């Protein structure tokens, strides 16, 4: 029994599932790269104030879910709970907004939230996100949504939907906020929810409790109170999405859990995951740059849960990624054979072929079991007689057929055999 266990609520990926995990992340990243987004590597922790100001102090993320601690210098730092605030801080700090706009970046990695662990909801979650900063253009909003849609489609996912709405702008939000507060004050809400309604009423709309959802059935909707500009922006986003062939469903009750969102807001939902149906989401944020000390530039982006996307693929029975660890499994029988096959394996790897070796002096039977487990297409077997003859046996592990190949030409022979 292990002396140590992984921290609660943190998934670990190892073969063969890790191959699927990597394939999901790379497929989503490739969709971003195809649209001209460059990679940015962000710190795992930041100044706590960055998230308090950027994400919003009244959000559950900041008030309940952040991993915050004082470092040895007495500074309050927080393990990153999301990526947009960090990307925005980096854009400002490094002057990226002084060049060509929009600044188009994507990121991936681990994020941290102290939540009650359950399927699809982890304390360390893997996410891939994109941010486009510097241009307020409905077509850019549509592009961002289309990038995620393309990534999901290339994975083979079909059971998801895109929910879309608008959260308005600085012109219409204040009057809507007042109407919503007036409505909420007339409801029999618990004390904590009442406080939230006074501090930030939109947060109440994000409440997932069934009893609260029932009370909110007749709440005023933001889409019914949009300014002329916000409504026109929203209509253009929908037009561009339709032009791109991206299907969506309007959900006027959609509210994201982060305060910086304005105008376009969206979520990717997969019903095969039960309660944790959201596999990604995002939106436009017009005031975040200025809030963090930068220029008054708008941005739009998303964060996609890699863990949840993998669960969605599994729920649909999709075989994602190459589960094989190698293409050819080298089986030496004896020390002299091992010395020669280790050299050949090195040559194969140099030629772009994934090659493994049965180390540890295994018997032929034991080594061939290892070959089967590796997922390799071929085994390259070398015994003492083969070595004397200057050839090895190349065995097709699917059909069982085998043939001798000259040791001096083994790399070329394996490469040829692997051709479609």
UniProtKB/Swiss-Prot annotation:
State the reactions this protein catalyses. Answer: tRNA(His) + L-histidine + ATP = L-histidyl-tRNA(His) + AMP + diphosphate + H(+)
Q: Which Pfam families match?
A: HGTP_anticodon (PF03129), tRNA-synt_His (PF13393)
Return the GO cellular component terms, semicolon-separated.
Answer: cytoplasm
Q: Name one GO molecular function term.
A: histidine-tRNA ligase activity
Q: What is its EC number?
A: 6.1.1.21
- Chief place where the protein resides: cytoplasm
Q: Name one GO biological process term.
A: histidyl-tRNA aminoacylation
Q: Where in the cell is it found?
A: Cytoplasm
Q: What keyword terms does UniProt attach to this protein?
A: Aminoacyl-tRNA synthetase, ATP-binding, Cytoplasm, Ligase, Nucleotide-binding, Protein biosynthesis
Family to which this protein belongs = Belongs to the class-II aminoacyl-tRNA synthetase family.
Q: How does it assemble?
A: Homodimer.
Kindly provide the name given to this protein in its UniProt entry: Histidine--tRNA ligase
Q: What's the source species for this entry?
A: Saccharopolyspora erythraea (strain ATCC 11635 / DSM 40517 / JCM 4748 / NBRC 13426 / NCIMB 8594 / NRRL 2338)
In the UniProt record, the gene name given for this protein reads: hisS
